[in-house]
Amino acid sequence: MQTMSSGIARPVLFLTAREGEYVLKDEFQLGSSSRSTPQITGSPLDPNTPVKRLFFMRINIAQFSRWDYPYPREYIEELKKIHGVHHVEENRDVPSILENYRNSKRKSHNFSSSNTPYLKLHRPASRAGAPLINAKSFISSLTFHDNIVRSFQPSIHGKTFVFANHEKSFYWLDVSAANSHSALLKMEFPRASPVCHDINSFTKSPKGLDVIIGFDTGDVLWYDPINFKYLRFNKNGQLNSSSVTAIKWVAGKDSQFLVSFRNGWLVLYDKYRHEQPLHIVVPEKNLKSLYLSSPGTFNILISINHRDDRKLNPVACYAFSKSPINGFCFSPDYQYLALVSERGTLKLFDFVKEHVLDVFHSYFAGLTCVTWSPDGKFIAIGGKDDLVSIYSFPLRKLVARCQGHKSWVTDVIFDAWRCDDDNYRIASVGLDRKLLLWDFSVSAIHRPKSAVYYVNHHSNNSKPAISDFDDVGDLTMGSEIDNSNYVNGDITIHPTLSRSLIPVISPITIYDVDDSPLSSVFFDPDCMITCATNGRIRTWQRP
């Protein structure tokens, strides 16, 4: 039996890989939202049955090798009081999240920015008196644990913070603290569900953290959990009312971040800029040219190079298609983006030049997740075809398919600490509750015999199937074909290739990590972290 820091005794759980055993080190169980999700009844085959959209729990980690910036108790107590407005660059007013509960009962406070929401602090339930929830607030309550002061004390062993979105709540946990399994902070949202978030590694310091959170309502929240500040963007969907699907900071920038939406838009924001009322109306006759334009597989609604003397948001805005963008990932040099869509396309986008380079298609169905290798040579994607597919970025082609999942793949990631010049470690999780580890070696990949036959017997006049042109452009069929790829200007549309033409990789490890579907997997130098849709976070000690 194993006793965890949480005091829970359980049988030792481990998974075996080539390098040794990953042993379950600890686990955290996030509670359910106080507002339960309504149950949807009816047959999934009935077109009148409402569709319940799945929002997976996602995590991000902020690590500090040393924590030598102590916050005295007096500082925390001061934060609990009403202390007006924080001031940041460009005259943008930022309200404090924390307010003294005793002095804030049903009081109204006016901030100089009319768009900033008002929030009351709600103490833990053990405190006498039920919290008063302001139904009009975007954030209904914020609860912080008493050990938040202890977590801010200096430590030579460093700090590891985990941020997680689950159901209608957002959590901040200190997983480096022994015998502590309570969230330092928990934010609850009455009318929105956080679906994704990201941490700015460029500005990360013990004095402040920049966290951005995307919601199913289209809202975006910038949040500094250390200084207790926040700002809200795309309020009530004023620019885009569809759900956020993914969100990332632009590397090397202290204020810019990218947001993708279910309507196929990708929007660049700056946290220091105000939002302008922007209404883009596209006539019905121009819809086809907007989403299926021959100069590219997208339309630039606002260019990143456009002149803006007023410095307003959005900085840039692109419409890639009418199909939801399910995820995107920056290349290590941050010049390129890989985007995956519900239509089943992988698009390689030059973020600097605002140009689509290549379009690939899944074996079938939508794509759900994407990641880039640490050296930028390979892209791994997961999808609803139960496959993990590996693409070579320099060669612009599909090089291998990883077969082993029995349901949708929900997350895929390269283990940067197990990758070198020729060997790569990939981890994936899915709705089948399984974690799969894959070892991918470039020199060990061999083309099937059927692939050699295909290359030798296909003429240069062969064309991709008509289905391959869905969501990629209003193309002229007379354009040049080279090696069965459709070239339109500088854009290459790659047809779907049969499984018999692509090498298949088998997993080195298959493990049932949880009794609920898995949503995320994450690596750090010392451990691997897995997340399940039931709110359970598990850390696995590396061999």
Swiss-Prot record:
| GO cellular component terms listed in the entry, alphabetical order | cell division site; cell tip; cytosol; nucleus
Q: Where are the WD repeats?
A: 239-279, 320-361, 362-401, 404-448, 513-542
Q: Which UniProt keywords apply?
A: Cytoplasm, Nucleus, Phosphoprotein, Repeat, WD repeat
UniProt keyword Cell membrane present: no
Where it sits in the cell: the answer is:
Nucleus; Cytoplasm; Cell tip
Please give the Gene3D superfamilies that the UniProt record associates with this protein: YVTN repeat-like/Quinoprotein amine dehydrogenase
Can you tell which superkingdom this protein's organism belongs to? Answer: Eukaryota
Which SUPFAM superfamilies would you find in this protein's record? WD40 repeat-like
Q: Which Pfam families match?
A: ANAPC4_WD40 (PF12894)
Q: Output the InterPro entries linked to this UniProt entry.
A: Apc4-like_WD40_dom, WD40/YVTN_repeat-like_dom_sf, WD40_repeat_dom_sf, WD40_rpt, WD_repeat_creC_regulators
Q: Phosphoserine modification sites?
A: S43
Give any single GO term for biological process: carbon catabolite repression of transcription
Subunit structure of this entry?
Interacts with ubp9 and bun107.
Function, in words: Required for the ubp9 recruitment to septa and cell tips but also for its enzymatic activity at these specific locations.
Q: What is this protein called?
A: UBP9-binding protein bun62
Chain's gene name: bun62
